[in-house]
Design a protein with these regions (language model features):
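Active-site-adjacent core segments of small-molecule enzymes
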Residues: 1-201
């Protein structure tokens, strides 16, 4: 059912079912790590990664209206594998919530990953012209592990045909719960199929 629903919406829009339009900018992720560690090298270790970041609005509503703000990040693991992280503005940590912008508001992974240290959320919050990335146990404090520096102003950037795969491209050591994968995978597959199909004539 999710596959068919997302395929129909994506075909009607000729775009992603959710977050149909966005702005893609390049950036640099400066990872300074965390202690105690989570068992995930991409979070615990230090490094500098070249990244792509896509900012988008969940329902695709016009700018003046509140919408769920999306922040999608493509980075690279210490072993060279792609790492995709999808974050959205939330009420608390787990409920998607519309906002007018990204300044001063939390973006969360919503679902907690499985990590060697236990369930782990990823989050981001604006920090100067960029963002601060952090991890947290579901009821624990946010612990910053990286700074995201953007090279361009997202308000002036164009979209790009990127497909983020947060389930397939999770950082080594992170894994989505099976219940979340069962929801995400047909939804993402349906959205891809709908975009390939395009609107009916």
């Amino acid at each position: 059912m999710l596959f068919d629903l997302f395929r129909a919406v994506a075909a009607a829009r000729a775009a992603k079912a959710l977050h149909p339009r966005g702005a893609v900018v390049a950036g640099t992720l400066v990872r300074h790590g965390t202690r105690p560690g989570t068992g995930v090298a991409w979070i615990d270790g230090t490094g500098v990664d070249e990244v792509l970041v896509r900012f988008s609005r969940g329902a695709g509503l016009p700018g003046p209206l509140p919408d769920v703000q999306g922040l999608a990040l493509r980075s690279t693991s210490p072993g060279g594998a792609p790492v995709d992280v999808l974050l959205a503005t939330t009420l608390g940590r787990r409920v998607p919530f519309p906002r007018r912008g990204t300044t001063g508001v939390l973006h969360s992974s919503i679902a907690a990953y499985r990590a060697p240290s236990g369930p782990l959320l990823l989050g981001a919050r604006s920090h100067g012209p960029g963002f601060l990335l952090a991890s947290a146990a579901p009821r624990g404090p946010w612990r910053p592990f990286a700074e995201l520096h953007l090279r361009d102003d997202p308000a002036r950037a164009q979209d790009a045909p990127l497909t983020f795969e947060p389930v397939l491209n999770a950082a080594p050591g992170l894994e989505f719960p099976s219940s979340w994968r069962r929801l995400r995978e047909p939804a993402y597959a349906g959205s891809r199929a709908g975009r390939a199909r395009g609107p009916a004539h």
